[in-house]
């Protein structure tokens, strides 16, 4: 991470590796052909960032074609909490995703 942040100010990535899934499903059994053995396995994109100790924030980023919410995670350099808050605010102001609501429907 240190090498990455020598060149870049932020890392922006999906909050999770999959879209929201059915409440009846404990966790995705497979993602892109890779078996998920535990509940934590499917959350690796968020889990590894948290373990690094870098400041991170999640912000709304729209909806899937099924109208389920998705988000992006903004990660900053060590101790740059204010920087990620500024970028998150700018993203929300520009996209207005936080103001959007999906149509209420059931499939």
PLM features per residue range, with description:
Residues 1-51, 102-106:
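Serine-dependent amide/ester hydrolase catalytic core
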Residues 50-107:
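Structural helix-boundary/capping segments
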